[in-house]
């Protein structure tokens, strides 16, 4: 495994020897990396290598999985994300998540975006939050005249942008994306990718993707994970982490080169 400190001045997350277990089974081992602020970091690697497992550590949604536990160090803006006094709900407000398949609530477009601020009791102008969030998600012009319609009536690509708007409405610091385009057509995928590049001016974004072309197009940094058999258990590990152009053009690890050139995984 290679761990590499990068010449960046500001890090949102830093992990050190991070291990994730499901019950007694080790799922991912010894992950050490620094996530730079206001850049897009991509996690790539074969199925089962722990990309999504590590992603869920960053907003503590692994806490919701029975038997899951994290060992090692994970800091968010220099503070221990797993300290006893840290409220996981507050963490998830600051660190939003967009899932593999669009999952709008069975509510109006307006109520989908307003849901988070309402639940959190945020003292904001909801009309303004809804409009601003939809504009940032590049959806406003398509839905501004039908905000009362059900969010589930939108196309798949529109639904995913609605989910992004819903995440933005609670004013997060980080956006996690777990295969956000895997269920979308190429045109919708390109729109989401363009949106990500716009959003990185204000937000730190981490994306899990099996699409290496997507990782090379949108990300600034790339982490390559792989998997090894330990007995009968598949254990994920970080192999290499560097600038995206390095990972795709001149990686230092042969396993990385084999993967990005299509000879593995």
Swiss-Prot record:
Keyword Transcription regulation assigned: no
Subunit structure: The complex is composed of two ATP-binding proteins (PstB), two transmembrane proteins (PstC and PstA) and a solute-binding protein (PstS).
SUPFAM superfamilies found in the cross-reference section: P-loop containing nucleoside triphosphate hydrolases (SSF52540)
Family: Belongs to the ABC transporter superfamily. Phosphate importer (TC 3.A.1.7) family.
Residues where ATP binds: 45-52
Species classification: Bacteria, Bacillati, Cyanobacteriota, Cyanophyceae, Synechococcales
UniProt entry keywords in alphabetical sequence: ATP-binding, Cell inner membrane, Cell membrane, Membrane, Nucleotide-binding, Phosphate transport, Translocase, Transport
Record-given protein name: Phosphate import ATP-binding protein PstB 2
InterPro entries in alphabetical order: AAA+_ATPase, ABC_transporter-like_ATP-bd, ABC_transporter-like_CS, P-loop_NTPase, PstB-like
Catalyzed reaction equations: phosphate(out) + ATP + H2O = ADP + 2 phosphate(in) + H(+)
